[in-house]
A protein has these predicted regions:
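N-terminal mitochondrial targeting presequence
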Residues: 1-53
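Boundary-proximal intrinsically disordered activation/regulatory segments immediately upstream
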Residues: 33-131, 232
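Amphipathic alpha-helical repeat scaffolds
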Residues: 99, 206-214, 338-344
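Short, aromatic/basic amphipathic alpha-helical patches
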Residues: 132-146, 320-321
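RNA substrate-binding interface of SAM-dependent RNA methyltransferases
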Residues: 142, 152-153, 177, 181-288
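A glycine-rich helix N-cap at a beta->alpha junction
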Residues: 145-164
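Structured adenosyl-cofactor binding patch, chiefly the S-adenosyl-L-methionine
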Residues: 174-176, 217-221, 232-249, 318-354
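Active-site/ligand-binding-proximal alpha/beta "capping" segment
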Residues: 281-336
């Protein structure tokens, strides 16, 4: 009887221990699953925050893709962010170009190509356009990637409106992410640049439409480079891009932060002379036609060498640049006090661009 009682007691203890072990194991399993869940959530959060950059770093090897119809697509979000945020454009060294015609002009130009770091990373094409049209443009903008068979991705009208930032997408056939050419600091630019004789400098020109128009005009009149001063609008801003018609990719550009840096770069690197051929557009100054004739008739290596500085319509050029430059003005017999900066720049570049 005692043996039986002892056996029952041992059996009870074993059962109790097993139940405890099972309960403990279940708790551990729950904690393990909970930890895995937290880790997974953290991973997903990190993955989401990095998705826009990942979308840009992918080389689009996926080939043909279904039409994108959602504005929440990660590639769509990236394109919108590139279009609207300068800091993101600078960080990614890329921008958004709208219009198949502009893209063709950019990539058919002999002035640059992949050697200058400009390439098409990805492109969206409206689903309204036929495949023959798409393939013709794709062959040009992806010309160095035939081995990867990269091609544009079709998108809905809703997505195209979002990416291009327009109210009506009927006339927008293409939107592409294109890498930006480098805008060098002024001193570095003039150390590397060769045969820079005609320069246009924008000192605080903030309107993107004016900046784009001035870039386009500078290219048209054969200017060699465009300088961008403090507070000047980003030339890769969507409106500036639209106005420049791709000139911002073909023109050499440099930037400066202080007037000291500006003049040091021009004089030491560019061999310009302040108060001689560094010319500031002012309301009061020498007649621009007389100055153009004088500088163009110099019997020396400096013949025709000129740097034109334009300021904002509201405040003009900065004080330091005004004091160290040669003031010139456009003769206007009418009663209008001043001209739009893009119009004034066009007149001056025509006068000195001969």
């Amino acid at each position: 009887m005692r043996k039986t009682s002892s056996s029952l007691a041992k059996l009870s203890a074993i059962v109790t221990f097993q139940r405890f072990s099972i309960a403990r194991g279940g708790a551990q399993q729950k904690r393990s699953l909970s930890a895995k869940k937290v880790t997974r959530e953290r991973f997903e959060s990190t993955k989401s925050s990095a998705s826009l950059s990942k979308a840009g770093s992918m080389n689009d090897r996926e080939g043909e893709e279904e039409t994108i119809t959602s504005v929440e697509n990660v590639k769509v979000k990236r394109m919108v962010k590139l279009r609207t945020r300068r800091s993101f454009r600078d960080e990614e060294r890329a921008c958004v170009v709208s219009g198949g015609k502009v893209l063709l002009e950019i990539f058919q130009a002999n002035a640059f190509g992949k050697m200058n770091g400009v390439e098409c990373k990805r492109a969206f094409v409206s689903e309204e356009f036929d495949d023959d049209y798409n393939e013709r443009i794709d062959r040009v903008i992806f010309r160095d990637d035939d081995d990867r068979k990269r091609k544009s991705t079709k998108v809905s009208a809703k997505v195209m409106k979002k990416v291009a930032g327009v109210e009506n997408a009927d006339n927008v056939d293409y939107c592409a992410e294109v890498t930006k050419p480098d805008v060098l600091e002024a001193r570095e630019f003039f150390k590397k640049a060769k045969m820079v004789r005609k320069v246009l400098c924008l000192d605080g020109v903030q309107d993107p439409g004016n900046v784009g128009t001035l870039l386009r005009t500078a290219e048209a009149f054969g200017f060699d480079a465009v300088g961008l001063g403090p507070k000047t609008c980003d030339p890769f801003n969507e409106k500036a891009l639209r106005s420049s018609k791709g000139s911002c990719f073909r023109m050499q550009m440099f930037s400066w932060k202080t007037s000291e840096e500006f003049f040091d770069a021009l004089e030491r690197g560019g061999k310009f002379e302040r108060r001689k051929n560094v010319l500031a557009a002012m309301l009061v100054g020498e007649n621009c036609l007389d100055v153009s004739k004088e500088l163009g008739s110099v019997d020396a290596d400096d013949a025709g060498k000129v740097c034109i500085v334009l300021g904002s319509e509201g405040t003009g050029v900065s004080k330091d640049i005004e004091e160290n430059s040669r003031a010139m003005t456009i003769p206007t017999p009418g009663v209008t006090e001043s001209l739009n900066v893009a119009v004034a720049g066009g007149i001056l570049m025509m006068a000195f661009g001969k």
